[in-house]
Amino acid sequence: ADPANYTGIQRSAAYYDPIGWKRAVREVTVAFEPDMANAGLPMSGAALSTLGVTNRLWPGGPLPADYEYQVDEIEFLHEDEYDLFLTDPTDFVIRYYWPRMFTSLAPLAKLPPLGGMFQGFEGLTAMLSTPEFAQAARAIEKAGKETREFRKNIGDSYAELAELGFP
């Protein structure tokens, strides 16, 4: 059962009220006694907003508080980029995928190919010290703090459900 339908909590609680969401999940689990319990996949809406997530829409963020979570099908791997991806997937993810998926990471698209940079990091320092990279670093730091706080508040929901007898 959907905690929002059963308990009346807004779906946005999964992103902005981790304690309330955890209580609602526990209430549904105890009421329905499933063979296996799912604590859901709540995440910090504040962190998602800070990062500028482009491929997901969540209640209380880009969507009204009572809407369902949605995926926005954006083309992250363009037809002419398969060779880049297959040659060096890590480079592709950092320089192409992340900047498309997170607006805050757009500056990463300006990085040179990373595959041959075994000892060349010092050459990147001028680029990495620009205001746009500093802004990206601040967004990462803020999102990290939001995520840590969210996780602290939600705790280990799976372990708590297991203690109630729901693996």
Question: What residue ranges belong to the model's regions?
Answer:
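Catalytic cores of TIM-barrel enzymes
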Residues: A1-P167
